Amino acid sequence: MKSRLPLPPPSALLPSFKGGLHDRRTATAIGRLLGVAMLVCMVTGVLSHYLQHPPSWLADDLPARPSWGYRLNQGLHVGVGIAAIPLLFGKLWTVYPKLFAWPALKSARHALERLSVAVLVAGAVFELLTGLLNTVQWYPWPFSFVPVHFAVGWLLTGALLLHLAVKWPDIKAYWWRRSAATRALPAEPENTPDRRSLLTGLAVAVGAVTVTTVGQSLTPLKDLDLLAPRHPDHGPLGLPVNRTAAAAGTTRVDTAAWRLTVRGPRPYELTLDELAALPQYEVELPIACVEGWSKNAHWTGVRIKDLTERAGAPGAALRVVSLEQHGAYRVMDMGRSYARDPLTLLALRLNGQVLTPDHGYPARIIAPNRPGVLQTKWVTRLEVR
């Protein structure tokens, strides 16, 4: 009878990791930068969500100023999110040997740490990947992007807080490098990059992806946005377009038959010529889209507050209805804070020219501090609420 050879212990089957680039100090150095990036993305993401989908109790009190607020918010959200991608790769590369640690679970605290790491990694990869694909408007999944992205963001925040609580002793020890023990790095094998090279490489990667994408919202760098899906100058009348008239089914608007219908205590209708004969105002406001691109433009049109006042409801909240028959935003609610703001227009002209079909001809909404999807195009009706 043949004797069987004894199986090696699990630890003997695990890979051996050497060098100073998988140590706690390096992980903490990268982790604090990634943590700040995630915090910025979470805060700006929540602000963006509630500006785009406000609860009923908040809708009338959303701030219309500063007029560039949403542009800054969404530029930070997308720009920092893209910059976080190389940081996440660097963090995962530094800590991945921990995945092979044995025994897999040592204690209840260790189990919590493992659970938080699993959710944290999965959530971070999901948020950054889906967010990046959203910037190019590619959605190769069966679910709705906005609610799922928002929900996973909260899940990721919870996992991050749990992870920080579990790892707080290490963070406290290595963040400020208080002792010789925490300042010391493990010996590094020959011909391997050192910690400084790793951090320098990450800094270069973050700088490169930022400089080549942030120009879609930061005008001085617009000619360097080689990797951005939008250039702020490319589009009809010098302004990009997300949803075209062809996609909305509004390429052929019968100008002679078109009417602006305003419903309120004193309802009325206006032809395009009658609307153009009303006092016109010019404002400079940005279009800022959730995908991250934005640009200032000059808009000319009639103040919304003048139209609601004529209907007997000055400064009232509105429901704006588009000629578009299909689309998530063909009907848009506008709270009182926007409707009574003097910068909010029913615009007829863009940069001195009559609106093109892609920009919402014959009339569109433009309002300060408001997501681009809520700047309704091809407007046909205003309903006082």
Language-model features: where?
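Membrane-embedded alpha-helical bundles that constitute the cytochrome b-like, heme-associated redox core
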Residues: 1-232, 249, 262, 361
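Structured, non-membrane catalytic/scaffold regions adjacent to prosthetic-group chemistry
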Residues: 214-385
